[in-house]
From Swiss-Prot:
Keywords: Menaquinone biosynthesis, Methyltransferase, S-adenosyl-L-methionine, Transferase. GO terms for molecular function: demethylmenaquinone methyltransferase activity; methyltransferase activity. It comes from Bacillus subtilis (strain 168). Methyltransferase required for the conversion of demethylmenaquinol (DMKH2) to menaquinol (MKH2). This is Demethylmenaquinone methyltransferase. NCBIfam families: MenG_heptapren, MenG_MenH_UbiE, PRK00216.1-4, PRK00216.1-5. The lineage of its organism: Bacteria, Bacillati, Bacillota, Bacilli, Bacillales.
Amino acid sequence: MQDSKEQRVHGVFEKIYKNYDQMNSVISFQQHKKWRDKTMRIMNVKEGAKALDVCCGTADWTIALAKAAGKSGEIKGLDFSENMLSVGEQKVKDGGFSQIELLHGNAMELPFDDDTFDYVTIGFGLRNVPDYLTVLKEMRRVVKPGGQVVCLETSQPEMFGFRQAYFMYFKYIMPFFGKLFAKSYKEYSWLQESARDFPGMKELAGLFEEAGLKNVKYHSFTGGVAATHIGWK
């Protein structure tokens, strides 16, 4: 079951990589950038920090971490899609971010020693992994004591009416946008499935705690369509 999901997700991102950034802006109405900016303000990344961005994709959050940590920082980005990483590599090169290293790897088995990073992030990637808890435990393992594990992800609005409209949007309109702008109806149908099945905010906070993280907090964005969860080691 896990292998099947992993293979399917890998195929999705290997196909949509060229239009991924554009589609993120289209389907979120540009809100994903604001959510990430707000999350970065909450994190308050220190200059010179060591950070890992798991499921980094095209490296937007990786680059945001590098900007916050400065030239003295050390930032790693990891993703299992080589095509997505190729887009990220070009951004890193164009921006001159010498403090960034992008790696091809698996979020379920992070290739780093225990207690390595000050911050470990995952943005719009946790819902696509085979096992949420395994990845959160791996993120906790590689973060330093006192460090932050941070997840920015789609969530499930709780307000009646808005919740129903949200799921209608994900089920019908988002795949249509995928077909219209990226010629990828099937792939964007999968993304709505993964968002639909992802835990709500309280349930995800519980998984953070089950992974061994402390003082878990979450922040809801845009009526609950997305949320940031932060836990400390």
